[in-house]
Amino acid sequence: MITPTSFEPVELLYSKKKVNRTNWKKNVLKSNPEINNLCERIYPINRAIQFGKQFHPGKAEVKQKLDKTAIIQLILQHLSTKGLKQTKQTLEKEARTTTPIVEGLNESRLVTYIRNALKDTDRIYDLSMEHTEYSKEERQSKITEREELLFQMDLLEDEDEDDGVNIWDEPTENIITEKVHTTEYDINKSKENKDDQDDEVVKFASLNKLVEHLTHDSKHDLQFLKTFLMTYQSFCTPEKLMSKLQQRYNCPSGHDEMATRNIQIRVINVLKGWVDNYYSDFDDKLIAMLRTFIDQIQIKFPAPASAVNKSLTKMVEKLSPVNDSKHIFNEKTPEPMVPKNIFSNNLSIYDIDEEEIARQLTLIEFEIYRNIKPPELLNQSWNKTKLKSRAPNVLKMIDRFNSVSMWVATMIIQTTKVKARARMMTRFIKIADHLKNLNNYNSLMAIIAGLNFSSVYRLKYTREELSAQTMRTYSDLEKIMNSEGSFKTYRTRLQNVPPMLPYLGVHLTDLTFIDENPNNFVTDVGGKQVSLINFTKRTLVFKIISLIQETQVVPYNLQPVHQIQEFLLNIRSDLKAHTLDQYQQELYRESLKREPKKAQRSDVL
């Protein structure tokens, strides 16, 4: 043990020494990294204690507010909002209690409480993640994984200003329309209203007002219905829409009898249209809510309720994994050009006919493309970390595009002799030409992108070996996919008769441009700032997604060849460890070996 008397001489002796004490903390941590490591480890604990004191009310307070009965009633109310009647009744019987009825409350209180808790927890979680041994990429990956899971559980949905307002109590000012004059039946007119007149088009509105317009007692806007059902998930969940339709159906007492009947019929028609055209929106939870709603409708409208029930039955069949309806073609399927060595383990690009490669590339990509659902194309889901789980097929298409582009560049760069490289380049140009003939603009653009990688584009002597005919073909293909005039030539070709596989990148760019424009219109209602949904934007989104839907329904009359598809699906097996940028850099280094800078033709093999 060191006593004060023994310590003083040491301090005195140390003080007389000339020691540089500037940056002492930095120097100590540098020479003793274990101290720094310890500080990093305990930092989140210290911070968590402070946050815990702020956000944790203590066991006694929690117990007073959340006893066993309160928790059971929260669960019962949650089951009620989700339409799970049988489960709710069983729990009521077992717990010997009833579900609390709260007027005007359609949101699950349990979910609301969990969301609020998560908001507070996020502060501790993010702070803790910031001070761990995870790399930046690992940390982001874990945060993304957590957020995607919570989004799938509907626990991180944005709050909706309409949540606490019953549709029948919504202020009349919360909708802004515009008169549009039309002289003939067009997309803004229903068949009921095709006389020369002014149409009222919704520009901005609250969710309640949008649903009210959707189910108006006297006006039937067919185009509005189509646009709404395709785009509603950009501002509302399916469960919320179902809840709002139920609110709208339950007209207040004293409401005009004829208007009430018309509104209720409109609600039923919306339900049927929703089920018939957007069955993929319905998970088990939403189906349970719909069945409960149908039971209510059955009392007053047995025939319409039966029609919705039939649609629901068909929908369940469509959602079944065993359902795989086949398209019947009028023309005979062309015979595939199968190489003699089709079963060889060493099958190469030179063994397969260029046209057959184009066919199989088209079948592979169209299978992904046809599965893209409208919600995947909303709110830039493919671009945003929190929403990527909602756009699996769009992300597959993007990944496939990158795979084909890198495959093209890799096959050319890996070919060591200049004449052989030119032969490989020629082969890809021929494949691209066949893709053009198949109206497969996505794979066509992927090959053009690969040929335009800087590592390939710089191969001057390789290009000089291409024939004049090949160069003309390549020039024509580039003109089709030229970005000039916002891809004017390509957009003109979209008028061709399907089957067709559009270049998805153009349409994702269009959707991004629309999404990044001002989202909502903020207006002053009764001295209160209210944010209204920009429905004009949804109309533009509808037009783009409609084009995609039109080309999804007409498949290619081609015969799949399993072995060739396996070959084309494995083209990127050795690239998985690289990002696109890393791989392009690696290819560029290889390209410099093939044709060094300032090299003469005689220097290149």
UniProtKB/Swiss-Prot annotation:
One of its GO terms (cellular component) is Ras guanyl-nucleotide exchange factor complex. InterPro entries: LisH, Ras-like_GEF, Ras-like_Gua-exchang_fac_N, Ras_GEF_dom_sf, RASGEF_cat_dom, RASGEF_cat_dom_sf. Gene3D superfamilies: Ras guanine-nucleotide exchange factors catalytic domain, Son of sevenless (SoS) protein Chain: S domain 1. One of its GO terms (molecular function) is protein kinase inhibitor activity. Residues 198-320 form the N-terminal Ras-GEF domain. Its main location: membrane. CDD domains: RasGEF (cd00155), REM (cd06224). GO terms for biological process: aggregation involved in sorocarp development; chemotaxis to cAMP; MAPK cascade; negative regulation of asexual reproduction; positive regulation of gene expression; positive regulation of phosphatidylinositol 3-kinase/protein kinase B signal transduction; positive regulation of Ras protein signal transduction; Ras protein signal transduction. Residues 67-99 form the LisH domain. Disruption phenotype: Grows at a normal rate, but are severely impaired in both chemotaxis and activation of adenylyl cyclase, both of which are critical for the early stages of development. Unable to aggregate. It is found in: Cell membrane. Residues 353-597 form the Ras-GEF domain. The keyword Repeat does not apply. Disulfide bonds: none annotated. Keywords: Cell membrane, Guanine-nucleotide releasing factor, Membrane. Ras-bound GDP/GTP exchange factor required for normal activation of adenylyl cyclase. Component of the Sca1 complex, a regulator of cell motility, chemotaxis and signal relay. The Sca1 complex is recruited to the plasma membrane in a chemoattractant- and F-actin-dependent manner and is enriched at the leading edge of chemotaxing cells where it regulates F-actin dynamics and signal relay by controlling the activation of rasC and the downstream target of rapamycin complex 2 (TORC2)-Akt/protein kinase B (PKB) pathway. Component of the Sca1 complex composed of at least gefA, gefH, scaA, phr, and the protein phosphatase 2A subunits pppA and pho2B. Interacts directly with gefH. This is Ras guanine nucleotide exchange factor A. The gene is gefA.
